[in-house]
Amino acid sequence: MNKVVVKNVTFGEGAPKICVPMVGKTVAALKEEAEMLQTIDLDVVEWRVDFFEDVKDLAKVEAALGEIRAILPETPILFTFRSAKEGGELAVSDEFYFELNETLAGTGKIDLVDVELFNEEADVLRLIETAHKNNVKVVMSNHDFDKTPAKEEIVSRLTRMEALGADLPKIAVMPKSAGDVLTLLDATNTVFEKANQPIITMSMAGTGVISRLAGEVFGSAMTFGAAKKASAPGQIDVNELRHVLDLLHKQF
């Protein structure tokens, strides 16, 4: 399997890397969050830009990103606009979604960009090309807040993401039972055994918490923890998360 190196973080080896979302609505709130995150043992910061009140002004988005980068110069930043259809805060046009991501990928201020799988393939491929030209890694994602698809469907989506050029394919699904969590873990293990790229998977909500902890066993390279406000159901406090991941890593 290929390793994916972003600054001083290597995906695809050792314990899952910890990503903490920033969800501030204003520049002041984001700066406060970034300063707090300086003190936390994390690997990646995700800016959930769909929470930002000035997201439709690209110049203000870039300026806010500059403020975050100044506070966290060595921390990998994942730039994510989560669409409303996949659980995000704001509905926007496809045109705006791609303009935002392509523009910010070209600023030199982000390290990874989230690209949602279920868009026009030509648009997805163009954004991947733009990201890679600017040395930005692509987290290609899909989120199902209603259910856990069949194992074959989860495997198919992750495999398709890799085929399209994702550096880190990602899927998050909602369990209705413990069996659904096992389905996600089984699919993760199946893809991990044959994939060329590290993958990121999780089963959400309380039932799925084990999937956020057991990535090193089943093959998920990153997990999401909450420092201030969880951006998705089931995210664990980042300090508790690090403790459990370290515990499992020592035994593995």
From Swiss-Prot:
Its EC number is 4.2.1.10. GO terms for molecular function: 3-dehydroquinate dehydratase activity. The active site is at H143, K170. Keywords: Amino-acid biosynthesis, Aromatic amino acid biosynthesis, Lyase, Schiff base. It catalyses: 3-dehydroquinate = 3-dehydroshikimate + H2O. 3-dehydroquinate binds at E46, W47, R48, R82, R212, S231, Q235. Pathway: Metabolic intermediate biosynthesis; chorismate biosynthesis; chorismate from D-erythrose 4-phosphate and phosphoenolpyruvate: step 3/7. Pfam families: DHquinase_I. Homodimer. Belongs to the type-I 3-dehydroquinase family. Involved in the third step of the chorismate pathway, which leads to the biosynthesis of aromatic amino acids. Catalyzes the cis-dehydration of 3-dehydroquinate (DHQ) and introduces the first double bond of the aromatic ring to yield 3-dehydroshikimate. This is 3-dehydroquinate dehydratase. The lineage of its organism: Bacteria, Bacillati, Bacillota, Bacilli, Bacillales.
